[in-house]
Amino acid sequence: DGLTWTFHLRDGLKWSDGSDLTADDFVYSWKRVCDPVVAAPYAETVLGMVKGFDEAQAGDLDALAVSAPDAKTFVVELSNPCPYFESLAAFATLSPVQQATVEANGDAWATAAETYISNGPFYITEWVPGSHITMSKNPNYWNADAIKLGSIKFVLMEDSNAAYTAYQ
């Protein structure tokens, strides 16, 4: 009917700390995007068509029509059909975040290597503000054998001329 979207998570999904990533993580994360305290800038763009969005934005997060009938199934109910919803669901704003880490660290959860728990092919191993971020291969990534790089280093530069000179 174009109103119910069901996503099936693959087996063996893990956070970079080795704990299981489940459909409940998506439920928490998507509701968090609607939280007026978080004030996510793209909330309406990516979730405005989800049933209960307005109520969730007003503070009733449980009104957002997202659910996890089991650990590997994430269900989203829309107010009306949205043919490009699959593309919106891939938007970075809707990436899952680990509830325990966010709740334990508040707004600082994403500002240090120790508290930035992720689920991608790399995880942050070093973060020196104003200098660099080093990411290492995540051994808990579902397809870790396909990742050939051992690490990536992002050099942080505010001066665009210095960045261009370093690039050359």
Which sequence ranges carry the predicted segments?
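Surface-exposed binding/hinge segments that line
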Residues: 8, 21-27, 34, 38-100
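Extracytoplasmic/periplasmic ligand-capture domains
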Residues: 3-39, 121-168
